[in-house]
Amino acid sequence: MIYYGTMFDHKVRFSIVRMREVVEEARNRHSLSYLATVVLGRALIGAALVTPWLAEKERWTLDIEGNGPIRRVVAQSTSEFTVRGYVANPKVELPLNEKGKFDVAGAIGQGVLRVVRDLGLKTPFVSQLPLVSGEIAEDLAYYFAVSEQIPSAFSIGVLVDSGGVKIAGGFAVQIIDRTLEQEKVELIERNIKNLPYITELFQKAEPLDVLERIFGEKVGFVETAEIRYKCDCNREKAKNALLVLDKKELEDMRKEGKGEVVCKWCNTKYVFSEEELEELLKFKVDNSGS
């Protein structure tokens, strides 16, 4: 569940989310290792936190590429409060870092963060920045500060063990009106700095309690929505993906008796029979003029 709203005469906006089930679904769909679960989980939470601020029908993509062993993590969210994502190396594992935590920064390494905002226009808006930490929360705050000139704080965490995902969630606070009194800015900064790790916080406190600790007072009107893992892949799109292949690749599949397309976002497998591949080959030939 995501909670979102504004504070201090709408000069500050916030979102806070708990989404253990969503991250657990991602872990199961992609058969993720512990570390890969934490990396993708953090990215999905980051993408979920911005959903209340998206335009209608907007698709927002966080794409992190680094020289670490996980290589790439991608998370996408929509204005309908859905998320989906994947990592390039779902089996990655590393020793715990010096703080005894999962080494997310080590898994990602040095690299770049891209944010793609697709508003349904001809060309999506793309921003690219160097990673500042590889921990994802700090990188998101840096992106908003530099690319969108919005001072932001993000805190994101995932706790996983042999039984699966135990806790997954985070919060984002953004100053959207620079006329906010300096004492309020300092209050928010101080309160956030004094908070424990989000995974520890969510073991003891509910989201509204966390917001009260951040702002130093009870929040007023809060909206809520359910975050869902949802992919828009289907058999027709999988068929179109096969049509992109050259004729020889399709013929090789047909000779093997079947063809498979696996969705990178949700790991759904679409299997096409020999007869279906024959039809695709015929369609390809008929439409190529050869």
Swiss-Prot record:
A single GO cellular-component term on record: cytoplasm
The keyword Cytoplasm belongs to this UniProt entry's keyword annotation: yes
Subcellular location, record wording: Cytoplasm
Coiled coil: none
Entry similarity comment: Belongs to the HSP33 family.
Alphabetical list of NCBIfam families matching this protein: PRK00114.1
Protein name in UniProt: 33 kDa chaperonin
Key words of the record: Chaperone, Cytoplasm, Disulfide bond, Redox-active center, Zinc
Gene giving rise to this polypeptide: hslO
Role description: Redox regulated molecular chaperone. Protects both thermally unfolding and oxidatively damaged proteins from irreversible aggregation. Plays an important role in the bacterial defense system toward oxidative stress.
GO molecular function, one term: protein folding chaperone
Pfam families associated with the record: HSP33 (PF01430)
A biological process term (GO) from this entry: protein refolding
Disulfide bonds: 231-233, 263-266
Chief location of this protein within or outside the cell: cytoplasm
Modified how: Under oxidizing conditions two disulfide bonds are formed involving the reactive cysteines. Under reducing conditions zinc is bound to the reactive cysteines and the protein is inactive.
InterPro entries in alphabetical order: Heat_shock_Hsp33, Heat_shock_Hsp33_C, Heat_shock_Hsp33_N
Keyword set includes Chaperone: yes
